[in-house]
Design a protein with these regions (language model features):
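Residue-level signature of mid-helix packing/kink "hotspots" within the transmembrane helices
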Residues: 14, 43-51, 169-170, 298-302
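Extracytoplasmic gate region of multi-pass secondary transporters
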Residues: 17-18, 247-295, 302, 366
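Helix-loop-helix hairpin linking two adjacent transmembrane segments in secondary transporters
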Residues: 166-210
Length: 379
């Protein structure tokens, strides 16, 4: 369930990056600056929302917290589809139109500045709603991981569900441009956004805490609680500001602050880079294959979750040292991205491979730093 939620999360996030250059920009007269503004504000709002998402999930519980998160971001994802109709209403007074009619109406308006201003504003609003919901995915998923896995296995569990981000990005180039080409970019947002509502129904039926789950037997409960945890006991309430006293809070925050920009930069701009430099469109088979290979290479990140368990079980290292060694190994992968630009003139496959390896390194590194927040607190 966590894997599929994260897959949907990244599918929703990728719709804009795979449609804006070839489908949305010509309609609304966007430039790279407009798209960059939208993605930057999304990232900022996502980061701010993360400050409160974990506390929200702790307060209302894992099950309800996840439902709220995916419900909000699915609504936000679907709202993107109606930005064209609303723009048509604002700039031309035509509100009761379909997607195709809205595009035709906007094309007849000569005031491109107004079209740009209105459409960018609407997409920013939709993006902020998406960010608000998506910020809850990882806190809820990590909390679920802490409930179902002992400390030594959490990095592996985290890397497995975090692979949903890669699989989501992997599925995106072979589905989203095809939907946009066949039925319009609006349907791409609606179709992918609807997946979240399907997931919500399954989550309501399936999720239960381990000690309340009839599919978890006593020996499995003992394995889960081998670190001395007892989910039946009332947890100590930790004030929000008290978290700032923990070293792992600052280590996690600083680590994500310094590294997430790398992931989001590659995620948001790689399709546009291929289009601008190599004239490879996201809707072309060549472009779909290139992006597919990019994220296929990123699946190497699964090793980042397995390696700490190997160090603990085979090398007798403690979980913390095992994670730190793993993070050091995969941090070196990002250096390969430095060769993407200078060697890119040889073939577009070189930056694809270099960036793919760098993204794998980031995701493996990220899977391990995610576990630090739950392994050294009373979760």
């Amino acid at each position: 369930m966590l894997f599929f939620a994260t897959t949907i999360n990244y599918l929703d996030r990728q719709v804009l990056s795979l449609t804006w250059k070839d489908f949305i920009a010509p309609e609304f007269h966007w430039t790279n600056t407009h798209y960059g503004t939208i993605t930057a504000l999304f990232s900022i709002f996502y980061a701010v929302s993360m400050l409160f998402a974990g506390k929200f999930v702790d307060k209302i519980g894992t099950k309800k917290g996840y439902l709220w998160a995916i419900g909000i971001w699915s609504i936000g994802a679907c709202l993107h589809a109606f930005c064209g109709i609303i723009t048509s209403g604002v700039v031309a007074g035509r509100w009761l139109v379909g997607f195709a009619d809205a595009r035709e109406t906007i094309a007849t308006v000569g005031n491109t500045t107004l079209i740009v201003t209105v459409s960018v504003t609407l997409f920013i609003i939709a993006r902020m709603i998406l960010a608000l919901g998506e910020a809850g995915n990882y806190p809820a998923a990590i909390k679920t991981t802490a409930e179902y896995f002992p400390k030594k296995d959490r990095a592996l569990a985290t890397s497995l569900f975090d692979c949903g981000s890669v699989v989501g990005a992997l599925a995106a180039p072979v589905t989203i441009p095809a939907i946009a080409e066949a039925w319009g970019w609006e349907m791409a947002f609606l179709a992918i956004g609807a997946l979240g509502f399907i997931w919500m129904g399954a989550w309501m039926l399936i999720y239960k805490k381990p000690h309340m789950n009839p599919r978890v037997n006593e020996s499995e409960l003992q394995y889960i609680h081998q670190d001395g945890q007892d989910t039946k006991k009332e947890k100590e309430k930790v004030p929000y500001l008290t978290c700032l006293k923990y070293k792992q809070t600052w280590a996690f925050a600083l680590g994500k602050f310094l590294t997430d920009g790398v992931w989001f930069f590659f995620l948001f701009w790689t399709p546009a880079y291929l289009s601008a430099v190599y004239d490879i469109k996201s809707s072309d088979p060549k472009g779909q294959l290139a992006i597919f290979l990019l994220y296929l290479i990123s699946l190497i990140s699964i090793i980042g979750g397995w390696l700490p368990s190997y160090f603990v079980d085979k090398k007798k290292m403690n979980p913390y040292d095992g994670r730190m060694k793993t993070m050091l190994i995969f941090a070196s992968f990002l250096l390969i991205a430095l060769f993407a630009q200078p060697l890119g003139h040889i073939s577009y496959w070189i930056p694809i491979i270099c960036v793919g390896i760098a993204m794998a390194g980031h995701q493996a590194w990220s899977a391990n730093i995610f576990t630090t927040a739950v392994s050294y607190t009373h979760l």
